Amino acid sequence: MNLKRLLAGCGTMALVLSMLSPALAQVDLGQFTAQGSVEAGAIPQPVPYDDAAAKYQEYRDLAQQFIVPKLQLILGDKAEKYYVQFDAVNVAQKNQMYSLRFGEYGLLDVQAKFFEIPHFFSDHVASTPYDENGSNFSLSSKPTGTGAALHSWLEANDKPFDMSLLEGVADINVRYTPTPSLSFSANMNYQNPTGQQPFGGSFMFGTSPGTFKVNELWVPTQYYTYNFGTGAEYAKNGWLVGFQYQGSFFVDDYSTLTWDNPLNTSGAGGNCVDSTTFTSTSLGGPCQGRAAMYPNNQAHNFIVNGAGQLPFNTHVMGSLEYGFWLQNAPFIPLTSNSKLQQSLSSVGAPNSLGGDVRPFFANLTIDSNPIERLDLKATYSYFDYDNQTPAITFTGVKSLNDVADAQTPFTAYPFSFSEQDVSLEPTYHVTDTIAAHFNMKWQTNHNAGLEVLQQDQLSYGPALDWNPYPWLSFRADYQHAHRDSPGYNNNRTSLVEVLGGTPGAIEELQDLRRFDEATLDVNQTSLYASVQPIEKVTVFSSFSYDDYNYPSTDFGLQHTSSYSPSVGASYDPLPTMHFFGDYSWQAYDWNTRSLDESTLPAPTPPAGKTSVWTAKGRNQGNNIDLGMDIAIPQNRILPRPSHLKIQYTYTVGDNRTHQAGDTAAATPAINYPNTGTEFNELMVQYEYDLRDNVAINVGYYFSNFGEHNFMVDQMANFMPHASANSTFLGNTDMSPYNVNVGFITLKYKF
């Protein structure tokens, strides 16, 4: 079979080659001219979509026997008034792209593009006992119990299937300029992902992984995003004013996902009977689970912008934007269990959200060069996220076993915030070879419905550019930032109000893990140097370091730091030869503190024990890139010019975690195994000019991926070490692979 594919590919190339004849640089078509190119060929041994190459094929398509990597056509009139350009990449493949541009110079420009983005998860690796119809998942049979009975039922009824997404994207942009001062524009963007992706449908969460009741499913994805825009601009005498409208509409074909409960063993399909008996380990409960998918929504934004020139070589630009973001999709019912007699109205909740956000954005930038050696740039921006969504209060909710939830009534409040930023960036050219910079930025946030009502952050630092010689350059910079976030309060009434519980205990601890709102100190620095020791050789090196500290956070994330040195070189012995290589190393360190919440509100551990866990970790990686790009002139061996490209990439990463400490119950912290990945890729491409307008292109790709990750290596449909009551897809998108791909194409220019 492999030989037949190879012969078929070579035969196709020979047929195309026999049809070609010498051509001019362009083709005359009366008053018009045409030029372009087409490249077509074959992959003698395609890479199938299967588990062996799942990760390699994740965002590409090499499963086709015959390929058209590129096609281009350019049309124009001899008076150079009109133009048309058409480009196609990866024709008829899952990662195909087509673009068209045409118009009249100085008057009309139309650009259209369509492309597809594949996302391949796996092929017949995941398996499930469910049958899917739209967004409804049903079971034709049920297990007789949990544990071994659930395992046996899965082995007898699960069916393998493939999971992948294919997103189609279309863009159209039109610009019309009737006069040099006035222009109109319009654009449209369309996005449509379709396919399947993993989803965890849960009936109940317990206090540990061993008490989960999880039914992992896949999401049948079919939604649409429509983005529209239109605008006008008027410019004259160094000033510009413009207006834009931008609208976005999101539509989901599947608003609700439902699935049969395998652990309600009263019967399958219509024979199932709902039950109020429902615990983390028992049978029974509702016949179906239900979850809401992405809700339909829309957004409208109106923008006014302007720019102009002022005295002292100063330029100013600014914009104002106001919008309406709306979402009013119906709520799904509170429960799918018919034995729990409650509805949205019975608990005091509306039928839909009534979501209404009114964003406002203002921006002003001034760029000035008042004296020869001084450059100034100042920016002010203001963003207001005005959330006018009404608060919703729930009363008398029955969560399990027809028993009222102890935490009701509770109210869900919307959150709002506003942010102001002021930045100043002066640059002074001390000499012709030295430039000194200073960057300063002040940022303040005013919040409503968040744990911190106000946050203030100030960042500042110098930078220096030094270029003493044309062949030598240096750059160094440093930034320090401090964010002040006083008044942590997770029980603020403007948040989700929960009655019951102990203020300052568990609720406060949950807040202290919100590191995005915590007091923060940041130090960042970077260095860069480039030198040409000889004319043909360039050597460069860089180093960056980031350090984040959370001084007011007792529990949660305490500290992170990252640093990345790198070095590289390039060598150009001839104008037609280029060799390069670089090496980089990255490391990210972190540490956290956590508390055994089961001991609250009075955490008094036994003697010799502590209720605090500490964890430290490092994610690090190494990367090497080597390559060459050579344009080979004609010689005695090769009578016509040719082109050779070779590139090799090696990447290895390792993630480590170390935990220490015992809980008050004397349960030790768990140290998990290290995880990591390794990646190798070699790309070789050789192009030889058979004629002035005909070239043959031969390429070879080798790719290798390996991993050691206990979290995905043990994936299975039934995992008793995690739960005896749950079903999983058994899928992984981290499968190791070795891939060899060769291709041959013919390129024809006219």
Feature-to-residue mapping (PLM):
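Gram-negative and organellar
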Residues: 27-30, 44-102, 106-750
